From Swiss-Prot:
<dbReference type="GO" id="GO:0005524">
    <property type="term" value="F:ATP binding"/>
</dbReference>
<keyword id="KW-0347">Helicase</keyword>
<feature type="compositionally biased region" description="Polar residues">
    <location>
        <begin position="89"/>
        <end position="98"/>
    </location>
</feature>
<dbReference type="Pfam" id="PF00271">
    <property type="entry name" value="Helicase_C"/>
</dbReference>
<dbReference type="InterPro" id="IPR014014">
    <property type="entry name" value="RNA_helicase_DEAD_Q_motif"/>
</dbReference>
<protein>
    <recommendedName>
        <fullName>ATP-dependent RNA helicase-like protein DB10</fullName>
        <ecNumber>3.6.4.13</ecNumber>
    </recommendedName>
</protein>
<dbReference type="InterPro" id="IPR011545">
    <property type="entry name" value="DEAD/DEAH_box_helicase_dom"/>
</dbReference>
<feature type="domain" description="Helicase ATP-binding">
    <location>
        <begin position="176"/>
        <end position="350"/>
    </location>
</feature>
<keyword id="KW-0378">Hydrolase</keyword>
<keyword id="KW-0067">ATP-binding</keyword>
<dbReference type="InterPro" id="IPR001202">
    <property type="entry name" value="WW_dom"/>
</dbReference>
<dbReference type="Pfam" id="PF00397">
    <property type="entry name" value="WW"/>
</dbReference>
<dbReference type="InterPro" id="IPR000629">
    <property type="entry name" value="RNA-helicase_DEAD-box_CS"/>
</dbReference>
<dbReference type="InterPro" id="IPR027417">
    <property type="entry name" value="P-loop_NTPase"/>
</dbReference>
<feature type="compositionally biased region" description="Basic and acidic residues">
    <location>
        <begin position="562"/>
        <end position="574"/>
    </location>
</feature>
<feature type="region of interest" description="Disordered">
    <location>
        <begin position="1"/>
        <end position="25"/>
    </location>
</feature>
<keyword id="KW-0547">Nucleotide-binding</keyword>
Amino acid sequence: MAVVTASSAGPSYAPEDPTLPKPWKGLVDGTTGFIYFWNPETNDTQYERPVPSSHAVSAPAHKSSVFVSSSVEKPSQGQRYDADGGHNRGSNNKIARSSSDRFHDGTSVHEGYGSLGVGSDISQESYCRRNEISVTGGDVPAPLTSFEATGFPSEIVREMHQAGFSAPTPIQAQSWPIALQGRDIVAIAKTGSGKTLGYLMPAFIHLQQRRKNPQLGPTILVLSPTRELATQIQAEAVKFGKSSRISCTCLYGGAPKGPQLRELSRGVDIVVATPGRLNDILEMRRVSLGQVSYLVLDEADRMLDMGFEPQIRKIVKEVPVQRQTLMYTATWPKGVRKIAADLLVNSVQVNIGNVDELVANKSITQHIEVVLPMEKQRRVEQILRSKEPGSKIIIFCSTKKMCDQLSRNLTRNFGAAAIHGDKSQGERDYVLSQFRAGRSPVLVATDVAARGLDIKDIRVVINYDFPTGIEDYVHRIGRTGRAGASGLAYTFFSDQDSKHALDLVKVLEGANQCVPTELRDMASRGGGMGRARNHWGSGPGGRGGRGGPYNSSYVGRNGGHGYDRGSRDSDRYGHGTYNADAPRKRSRSRSPNIGSGWSGKKSRFTD
């Protein structure tokens, strides 16, 4: 459990917090683990965080773009949540809007973790402005800019420092106090922003307060689009949940169900799962979600892009309507907005950066090289030789065949290894472990690894082939420049990619990057097709109605968008036709132009 260990039920001192006004001190209730505050001169105690009277600021009760708040607000006795701890929802998990509070006793179980202000050396407005934080919602707590200010148990704070983190990232700083109040959240932030710990840390505290019998099912459920991201989330949960003594299992396709079912039968607090595999196990009646009170949708935009919406909605129907729901996404298209409106109640939206346009990480230096296809091999070798030996580098290819071919050519001199959908789970795990350890410092991958792959110290990303859409480009290069580090991205761009030229120019300009003259010329000649549509392909399209054959989203057979409702595997595509772990035959509708993708009636997912 995520508790503060103490020899008795008496209070103990909280970690030193230099932002507290003197002479106030933080104390931890030895029974509940709540943080409260004590003035040794007056012997007053209170849950509200004390603020200097000279610059106390009241929290606005209206929606705000940059939020300012300064103290814990105890819920009034008139505010009550449902008896089982959640907002009122309809029978189909459709929102039944209610002003009721979340806990039946009239107080929040997270009072001690409420709106803890930022340090006196920087105003909350300045912090939000500097980190491009905007918040929509009423009575939103101020960001927590230090681990000590969070009120997390000292063991968790110690683990964060031991992992090399000096302070919360912006998404953590703003989302933690909201989540700790038990509220629903939509958090929109770029990849590499620290979102995983943004929801895991409050999950540990949630477990401390509301842990159920793990033999009867999990308390925490995290849904993830890919097995790679799911296993990484599990690793983070185990790493930072040691002091909380949590049990966590991971459910994903492409691996035998037996070991996963055995772990479930032993009882777990947290389940991290891909939607397809979890649906399989639900249909087998081998897991119950009836105790889940904390639900996370990680990379929600990617899950919808991959067509998981039917599976997600089916899963959510198995989860109690009285729950806390957190949705994390890198982008904010219409589909994500719709499912957020359906599944979340009175949510607070936290934005890091501009969510209305696709923005690349500005800490990544992007080099676009307009080259002929036959020049790519020579150029990639030049780039690899120019880097420090042992530097971790990811090279993205558009097809499995090219991925294998390129890795074979680079293995001898550069220690390259390949990962794609035809690799077994064991092969993938081995290649990733070798890459993480630096024994195979060059990873050649298809887009199966483009989202959710969280490996530290990736110095360079090379786009050997340009992806099928500008969104995937941004997510690919986002493998480097993570957690505040700088990164390099090289992209080979050919005439066959000219339809993406205008969109690429916009991304480069938005990140203050140099735009090559040749690329700008391509865009001026009409490349990109971006003027007739937005980034989400909402313009007129073919049978799928999703923006025509150049839309970067995935389109199933007969215009269907995504995976089959009856899919049996987390990686099966369309009407049960796509399986990332089995060899696939090429469709006869494949265009002879390699760069043109699939026709409008077929899936354009090439991995």
